[in-house]
Amino acid sequence: MENIAPALLEWFYKNQRILPFRTDPSPYHVWLSEIMLQQTRVSAALPYYERFLAALPDIPALAACEEEKLHKLWEGLGYYSRVRNLQKAARIVCEQYGGQLPADYDALRALPGIGDYTAGAIASISFGLAVPAVDGNVLRVFSRLYNDPGVITEPAVKRAFTARVMEHQPPEKAGDYNQALMELGALVCVPNGAPLCEQCPLASLCEARRAGTALELPHKAAPKARRIEPVTVVLAEDAEERFLLQQRPEKGLLAGLWQPLLWEGEALSAEEVCVRLEALGLACESIEPLPAAKHIFSHIEWRMSGYSVCVGSAEAPAGCVWASREQLQNEYTLPGAFKA
């Protein structure tokens, strides 16, 4: 196959989206954008990106940020382990590299939360290093370009595709080339529907287009079934119209975040909830059921039943706090599961 870079780059320079982390591709900006975009669409992430940078304009500011403020800045993006790793890495960068990301792929790859793709994106876009940055968009483009039925979630297949990506990469324009492939996958060679082949600068080279197999590619491994977990959520309100929050453990799902009272296991009856509240020193003055709901994590599905409970005046149990509506809005970070 002839080299795809000339046609790809010509298309990219004419059609790329104007994004703040492209306008100013400093290492910190590229890093932050890539972490945010791991599980979030560009249009949804941009307001968070701008708000985050306004509050934490550089790596030392990120490293020094208080945990609750950090979580609040991330609130709405989900997958909070991303921002915790972001801060862990920022602290290492301050300790070992003077607050500036290292211009070295392996050093970037060694930082918490930075994998092959993110390290490659920072190294190529911000530092001009000739390294790959292969994400799902790029794998899809190359799966169709070569009409390759390999399962792209398998490590050996990904390595083979990465080698092909590098065969076409112009070393002097590595960052632009990597971004162009991502952009092509995001805008033209799209998933979950018909690719826009008539708009593709690589259409004349695409083997899947010639074979009529573009809609069938790429192949992925079947997803693992999510584990179903019943939980009971209790919105406990006191006489001062404050709500009881408990902090989740420092490790595991939603680590360190705040939530209403929650019990895992089979759905509890109203009587069982009142008994448990009384064991915490809370008198159940009135109780009303809440609509059933569910929340899907990457590997777990919560089936949520719940109650709204008035408990009168009481001290917060150990590990809990009373929070006003204003504090819920401005101080405490609640996961999206509890915002229905």
Where are each of the predicted segments found?
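Catalytic cores of DNA base-excision repair glycosylases
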Residues: 2-198, 202-211, 215, 283
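Intrinsically disordered, low-complexity, charged terminal extensions of DNA damage-control enzymes
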Residues: 1-18, 23, 186-340
